[in-house]
Amino acid sequence: AINAKKNNSNILVVSKTYPTHSQSVQAQGGINAVLYEDEDSVETHIEDTYKASCKLSNKENIKLMCQNAKDTIFWLDSIGVPFNRTSNKRIAQRKFGGTKKIRTCYSSDYTGLKILHTLYDKCIYENIEFKNEYFFLDLIIKDNTCVGAVFYDIVNGEVKEILAKTTIIATGG
């Protein structure tokens, strides 16, 4: 939503809960990223992640995620996520389960909560609209093109259509 807003688009985020009530607030550990190449490598990060998935995950997806992790952490830092810092002001990292190297970036023991609140605050700052307590039912398809979605308004008990030029489904997990 934040990146789409850069194009001066009208953005609407629809959620079955309030944005700050998701399971992300429970995530404590942190996010793995190779920030400093002299101490770690993306290749080792890829190997660790693939091994931790019992070699069941798509290795190309893991590669893409690990290659983009550094930029993602620095972007989160730039919008205000309060990552812990070392004495020389670098983003602090700690060792976490299943890793050979120290690469987990964290915000005390509230990493998910801090990231979620920072992203939500950024959305509010960017005037991104939210419709909460809307349960997704179906996509609206016309001539093989998605033109929106149908939702159940949990509060009012009504079915509502929301039309859109672009529909993005981000289900988490």
What annotation goes with each model-predicted range?
Residues 1-13:
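N-terminal Rossmann-like FAD-binding beta1-loop-alpha1 element of flavoenzymes
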Residues 3, 23-24, 167:
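Hydrophobic/aromatic ligand-binding patch that stacks against planar heteroaromatic rings
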Residues 15-147, 151-158:
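Conserved N-terminal/central alpha/beta ligand/cofactor-binding core
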Residues 161-172:
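Short hydrophobic core segments
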